[in-house]
Amino acid sequence: SDPNEMGDNLPTVNLGTGRTVLAVASSDYHDCAILDDKSVKCWGDGGTGVRNDLMPGGDLILGNGPGEMGDNLPAVNLGTGRTAKAIAVGGTSSCAILDNGSVKCWGGNSSGQLGQGNIISRGDTAEAGHEMGDGLPAVNLGKGRKAKAIATNGETVCAILDNGALKCWGDNAYGQLGLGATGNREIGRAHV
């Protein structure tokens, strides 16, 4: 990029009037931020968890047109009363650790990276509304388990649990789940 476009010449990302950012995660296709009110806003292509009703046909790309950012950019619906503690994004999927320690993932799901026991994408279509919020199940981390940290490359997700254990799910073509074998884990529960 042109050095004259950086520094004071580089505009800030407008995420809403008076909003500040606590955490941010970035992928090749989209970005997500946890705001000072613990809500999540995502923009870019895929993994945003919201439909862009500002464009004809509900374009899923947010942030590339006038009037799409700031107060017009909706927060991701994580469920009634739920807020985010941590966010991870990769490719066209996103995962958040919620205030209660549960994990919810949305977006593309070609390798089972959403942890729902299938390869059905969620929150990435014009019908995203019913797939999000209370309609988006939390990932089954095990009885009573909560997540402390989360990371994803877009196809594989790993979470550090409250007991210090690590669970990973999704793409395993190269053994990246650490299970001593290959083959994706598309089942509804995470594996160690």
Tell me the role of every PLM-derived stretch.
Residues 1-6, 41-70, 107-132, 170-189:
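Short glycine/serine- and acidic-residue-enriched loop/turn motifs that recur at repeat junctions
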Residues 1-6, 12, 17-20, 35-39, ...:
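Thr-biased low-complexity repeat/linker tracts and other Thr-enriched repetitive architectures
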Residues 21, 28-31, 84, 91-94, ...:
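Conserved positions at the start
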Residues 27-28, 36, 90-91, 99, ...:
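Short loop/turn segments that connect beta-strands within the blades of beta-propeller domains
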Residues 30-33, 42, 93-96, 105, ...:
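Conserved core positions of repeat-based scaffolds
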